[in-house]
Amino acid sequence: MPLVPKRVKHRREFRGKMRGAAKGGKYIAFGEYGLEALESHWITNRQIEAARVAMTRYMKRGGKVWIRIFPQKSYTAKGVGVRMGSGKGAPAGWVAVVKREKILFEIGGVSEEVAREALRLASTKLPIKTKFVTRSSEVGGESNEG
């Protein structure tokens, strides 16, 4: 089941700015281990789903995964070969606006080695640099550029 909003007030949105760090969602709230964004970027619903599948396949049937981001912003695209003007394009997909320091995914109920590898596999599906964090080391954490 794809991650899309059930209904929206406006089909087309402005692009917006991604200045600064995240205001909320900076700390692990549910699991023991998390994946923190080191850059700001749009992350599509397909990228989120690919990361989720990569994590759950590696963990087999152990543990629990929490997705802390949701793609609630629509983006538009005009057809190939269409000239400039004539209005905004049709909605093409959904993205989550992710700012740096935001926790993207959380894992609980597995060992640290399993969680570290599962989140590393998930990070390869995302277009940003990420970092593995634990509940005990909220401030620091080991860097996992990839």
Swiss-Prot record:
Any single GO BP term: translation
GO cellular component: cytosolic large ribosomal subunit
SUPFAM superfamilies in UniProt: Ribosomal protein L16p/L10e
Molecular functions (GO terms): rRNA binding; structural constituent of ribosome; tRNA binding
Keywords on record: Ribonucleoprotein, Ribosomal protein, RNA-binding, rRNA-binding, tRNA-binding
InterPro entries, A to Z: Ribosomal_uL16, Ribosomal_uL16_bact-type, Ribosomal_uL16_CS, Ribosomal_uL16_dom, Ribosomal_uL16_sf
The keyword tRNA-binding is assigned to this record: yes
NCBIfam families (alphabetical): rplP_bact
Reported function: Binds 23S rRNA and is also seen to make contacts with the A and possibly P site tRNAs.
HAMAP family in UniProt: Ribosomal_uL16
Subunit structure and binding partners: Part of the 50S ribosomal subunit.
Similarity section: Belongs to the universal ribosomal protein uL16 family.
Protein name: Large ribosomal subunit protein uL16
Protein source organism: Lactobacillus acidophilus (strain ATCC 700396 / NCK56 / N2 / NCFM)
